[in-house]
Curated annotation (Swiss-Prot):
Gene Ontology annotations for the cellular component aspect, listed alphabetically: bicellular tight junction; endoplasmic reticulum; plasma membrane
Entry keywords, A to Z: Cell junction, Cell membrane, Deafness, Disease variant, Membrane, Non-syndromic deafness, Tight junction, Transmembrane, Transmembrane helix
Residues exposed to the Cytoplasmic side: 1-7, 103-115, 184-239
Species this protein is from: Homo sapiens
Family per similarity comment: Belongs to the claudin family.
Iron found in the keyword field: no
Transmembrane segments: 8-28, 82-102, 116-136, 163-183
Keyword Lipid biosynthesis appears in the UniProt entry: no
Protein name: Claudin-14
Membrane-related topology note: Multi-pass membrane protein
Protein's job: Plays a major role in tight junction-specific obliteration of the intercellular space, through calcium-independent cell-adhesion activity.
Tissue specificity annotation: Liver, kidney. Also found in ear.
Lineage of origin: Eukaryota, Metazoa, Chordata, Craniata, Vertebrata
Length: 239
């Protein structure tokens, strides 16, 4: 029962991490900067994500533009794209494997493959969390270095966006959930199919042979009236 509860907790945390990873990948709030004008109506906020960059006006208007050229993007952005996409794919595969391997499901019930699927799902969740952690950590380091670079003008400096914080939380949930899924399968005994005990067989190899009297005593019977003489000797003894 405790192992089942640990599996459910691990799957729930991993599933939340997968959802957070998807949202982090889509949101444009990876880098943000704010330029406030002389009037509150002229306040503008710039946002940059993996797939688009947006401009938010104080009037509530969003204007987003998708990146047109892939080769024109910086290398850190291209690497973050690849890492986050792979992390999302691994999270989806891990979710399917974990559903099959959990004890509360009927898929592959009573087979050793069920434990294998649970361990595989936990391992993939851990790998997905690591990839997401690397992507958001790399981007955060790049943002911090550029922010404290005195050679860059203030208009080109960005701050850490909300999507990076969400990425850290999501990757942590995936790592914790995947670890719980793997640990919940360690205490289980290996599956062994039931084997009926062998039946007792009767062997005649050690039984004693039937007793047979010697041939000399075959005719050693009590004398009858017709075959015995008056002296008590049998007539057959003289034949």
């Amino acid at each position: 029962m405790a192992s089942t509860a640990v599996q459910l907790l691990g799957f729930l945390l991993s599933f939340l991490g997968m959802v957070g990873t998807l949202i982090t990948t889509i949101l444009p709030h990876w880098r943000r900067t704010a330029h406030v004008g002389t009037n509150i109506l002229t306040a503008v906020s710039y946002l940059k994500g993996l797939w688009m960059e947006c401009v938010w006006h104080s009037t509530g208007i969003y204007q987003c533009q998708i990146y047109r050229s892939l080769l024109a993007l910086p290398q850190d952005l291209q690497a973050a794209r690849a890492l986050m996409v792979i992390s999302c794919l691994l999270s989806g595969i891990a979710c399917a494997c974990a559903v099959i391997g959990m004890k509360c499901t009927r898929c592959a019930k009573g087979t050793p493959a069920k434990t294998t699927f649970a361990i595989l799902g936990g391992t993939l969740f851990i790998l997905a969390g690591l990839l997401c952690m690397v992507a958001v950590s790399w981007t955060t380091n790049d943002v911090v270095q550029n922010f404290y670079n005195p050679l860059l003008p203030s208009g080109m400096k960005f701050e850490i966006g909300q999507a990076l914080y969400l990425g850290f939380i999501s990757s942590s949930l995936s790592l914790i959930g995947g670890t719980l899924l793997c640990l919940s399968c360690q205490d289980e005994a290996p599956y062994r199919p039931y084997q009926a005990p062998p039946r007792a067989t009767t062997t005649t190899a050690n039984t004693a042979p039937a007793y047979q009297p010697p041939a000399a005593y075959k005719d050693n019977r009590a004398p009858s009236v017709t075959s015995a003489t008056h002296s008590g000797y049998r007539l057959n003894d003289y034949v």
